[in-house]
Amino acid sequence: MRSPDPDPAHPRPRWIVFGDSFVMADNEPYERTFPARLQALTDDRVEVLSAGVTGYGPDQTWMRMQQLLPKWKPEAAILVICAVNDFGDPVRNNLMRLDADGVLHRQQATPGPQDREWFLQRQEESGRSGLARLWLAWHQWRALEVPKHPDQTLLADYMRAEREDYEAHISGSTVANALLRDIYDADVAIHPEWPSSQYKLRLAEAILAGIRDLCAEQGVPLAVVVVPGAPDADPDYWLRPDPGRYPGWQPERLTSEWQGICERVGVPVLNLYGTLKDAGHRVFVGALDPHWNGAGMDLGARTALPFLESQGWSLGR
């Protein structure tokens, strides 16, 4: 975990925050991340652990919770949903699938050749000196140029790729693809009537129901915090869909669908769409990055704490 090691004495209430890079947030110093800000806002009366893993979807997070909940025995668990790609991640990961009767099944999956090559390259680069890696990263970032206008062509490419991912998934593929890429759930946001979109919603609901049941078995209260991404909540983001070209797009749809899923499975949910949308670009990283920044995580923590208190979660003494 990115947070400090759990206190073995466990003298305070312990909350664990699960999710992906919206939780791990290695683009910010740890003290500016959502879990760290949440703990600071309790005046350190609550120990808040950060169990987020960059690139994880809700399916992988469920498996991580199976390991960490019995080990660290928290008083509560928070699942942060990244409403950029968390619908699509389980389809690309191919670790879980629904059969024709809607029953969820697990299976083994292996990374595709591009992902394996990426990991091997990063493993090789990790042996270089810090200065050499910094120099390489600087040159890579210099080569990136933010488009002057939203890239609507890329959105069409995303939707085509999402249809292909869906077709491979339902045909039984066991190859995991795009493990660390932020692929916007454009099909759900723009075309909720598509089979790929409808399947993603059903799969997400089955996964969240499994997470709910796991937490109930462990005696751990669960709450979900849904965080929008820059394509939907930052008016200046480069990948923001054009309503003229995509009249079916609703910027609040991804977060609203997650909220509806939580309500149907009976999990308390906080939807941060309105909060972050009103704050605009100042709470997002900007450029080519869809993540919230330190200001966004602070605002999210300040909004989440009263919500969690309203669920009866103890803040200790």
Task: List each model region and its residues.
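Serine-esterase "nucleophile elbow" of acetyl-processing enzymes
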Residues: 1-54, 59-73, 77-78, 117-131
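Generic structural signal for small/hydrophobic residues in well-ordered secondary structure
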Residues: 20, 61, 77, 215, ...
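Short, amphipathic alpha-helical "lid/cap" segments that border enzyme active or binding sites
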Residues: 58, 62, 201, 205, ...
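Serine-dependent acyl-ester chemistry module
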Residues: 82-260, 272-282
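Membrane/wall-proximal cationic-aromatic binding patches
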Residues: 1-41, 65, 159-190, 256-258, ...
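Second-shell loop/turn segments in exported
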Residues: 21-25, 50-51, 197-201, 247-248, ...
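Histidine-centered active-site loop/cap adjacent to the catalytic His
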Residues: 288-317
